[in-house]
Every structure is written in C-alpha cells, then in structure tokens.
Amino acid sequence: WGMDVYGHKDSKLLDGDIKLWIAKGYATSQETATLAKSTYKFTGTPNTELIVDLDTVAKSIEGKAEVLDTRSPDEYAGKNLRGNARGGHIPGSVLVEWKQNAAEDGSFLPASDLKDLYASVNIVSGDEVYTLCQTAVRATHSWFVLSELLGYSGIAVYDGSAIEYANREDTALE
C-alpha cells in the first residue's frame, strides 16, 4: 500500500512466512546486510485515492462505503483497547480479521476463498471499502488482498485507524 501511494508499482510481497520460505529450499542468511547509502528523493505526487481520513470514515456511517475492520475480534468488541481511550468499532463496520486472509503458513488463501470470505460480509467487487485496524498496518494487508489479489477497485486505507478514531470523544463507537 505504501509503495503504491508513492507510485512504486513494481513492488513485491513474500507469500508465506519464513518457515515456508525455508521449506521451499530458498536461501537464507544470518549475515547482516551492508547497504550503500541512497540518495533517493520522492518527487512525485502521493496517490491520495488510496488514503481516507477521519471525516471520510465518519461520513461513511451514513453513506454507501463499507468500513472493513481488520483488527482482532476482541478489539472489535471493545474487550482489548490496545491503549485507546475507548473501545469498540465504528457503527456499521464489518469484521474480517487480517489473519483470515492467509493459511497457517502465512501464504494467501486462493482468490476464490478470499472472494467468498469477503462476500460473507457483503464486500464484493465494485464496493467502496475503507480498511482500518489500530495503526494502519494490518489494514494494509487487507487492502493488498482486496486491491491486488482480488483486483477490486475503490479500496482505501484509513491511515488514522483506531488510534485516531477511538481516542476522540466526537466519534461514534459501538
């Protein structure tokens, strides 16, 4: 997601965890890499269509966009506050924990399974969807699944996520 926001379209993501990597016989190393200092400077324009803010998410409660909460069930239910002032979830949001996108070895589920998973909470191709979690890390995983693996358009990350939303007194939570 971050790479796409800043215009880097040819980025790659490891499909699976390190145990799967090793099981497939790929090389690993215990050496610390030495990298040359970079002079790279971003000169483009960030793709703000991939980011939504608090106001946009708050308006979605009454609007047509789906809010996809990717946190744990305990966070969604308000049982685990993760240091936030308040717990719970945005009214009308749906829960698909980010971990549900992957098999036990960390590899992504087949596209047909992922489509079924999201259809079970009424998220389908063509929907406008805003993903969130606590700090927009897990939310980007689900953004990748919806945007890149399933090819859905209209998917954006609420960068402020729960750390912003649940620490304000003027936002609705259930």
Where do the language-model regions lie?
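Short, flexible loop segments at boundaries between secondary-structure elements
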Residues: 94-103, 160-164
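Helix-loop module immediately N-terminal to the HCX5R catalytic loop
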Residues: 98-129
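Active-site neighborhoods of enzymes that stabilize oxyanions during catalysis
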Residues: 19-91, 170-174
